[in-house]
Regions:
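Short, flexible beta-strand-to-coil junctions
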Residues: 52-55, 78-83, 184-186
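Active-site or metal-binding loop neighborhoods of secreted/extracellular toxin and effector enzymes
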Residues: 97-187
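Generic hydrophobic, helix-prone segments enriched in Leu/Val/Ile
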Residues: 7-10, 14, 40, 75, ...
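Generic alpha-helical secondary structure signal
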Residues: 31-34, 82, 170, 174-177
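Catalytic toxin/effector domains delivered as secreted proteins or via bacterial secretion systems
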Residues: 60-89, 93-116, 125
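N-terminal low-complexity, intrinsically disordered segments
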Residues: 1-70
Length: 187
């Protein structure tokens, strides 16, 4: 699909019962974020994955050891190449959040996960052992890029770039609001 058609379909997806069921299965706390994510898509950032940012504490169900799970808010997806530079610039100038263009590389290039940006961590026990649960690379293998492009239903002929936004502070809400505010200024 052309970018605007894919954008309209992405916006409509947020209203579908199947999509909401999938969100509930994956992370029910994201339900309250759907309206703002829909607006972000409407303003030209077709999202393929996101997390709002949270902190939770508890005790492990088997070991009884205390743990703390911390998430960074993040958002990733496609934007028209013509809009991306101003968006990234404004995110860097007008917010305390991060936005980067993610280049596509050959599937043959090794991307060590130890060099990725941590997105979700768990601290367990005393002394605290920190485990990285989810992370994102600063480059995308071509096959992953194409998989995301297919998920967004974008034609290969569309001049789009992959954008990754994240909050450096663990557990903080507000990334989505800042992204939407900057999109309204930039796109």
């Amino acid at each position: 699909m052309k970018f605007n058609e894919a954008k309209a379909q992405a916006v409509a997806l947020f209203n579908s019962a199947e999509f909401k069921e999938r969100v509930i299965e994956e992370d029910a706390s994201m339900l309250r974020q759907l309206a703002i994510l829909q607006e972000i898509n409407k303003h030209g950032f077709i999202t393929v994955n996101s997390q709002a940012g949270a902190k939770t504490k508890g005790k492990h169900y088997e070991t009884g050891k205390p743990y703390e799970n911390m998430e960074r808010a993040y958002l990733m997806g496609f934007m028209l190449e013509t809009d991306a530079a101003l968006f990234i610039k404004n995110m860097g100038i007008k917010t305390d959040k991060n936005a980067v263009f993610v280049p596509v590389c050959s599937d043959d290039i090794k991307l060590p996960s130890a060099l990725d940006i941590p997105l979700t961590i768990t601290k367990i026990g005393f002394p605290k052992e920190t485990r990285i649960d989810t992370h994102f690379s600063s480059a995308l293998p071509k096959s992953t890029f194409e998989s995301f492009r297919k998920q967004a239903k974008l034609n290969k002929s569309e001049k789009v770039v992959f954008i990754f936004c994240w909050d450096s502070e663990w557990g903080r809400q507000g990334l989505f609001k800042d992204v939407l505010r900057v999109l309204k200024l930039s796109v």
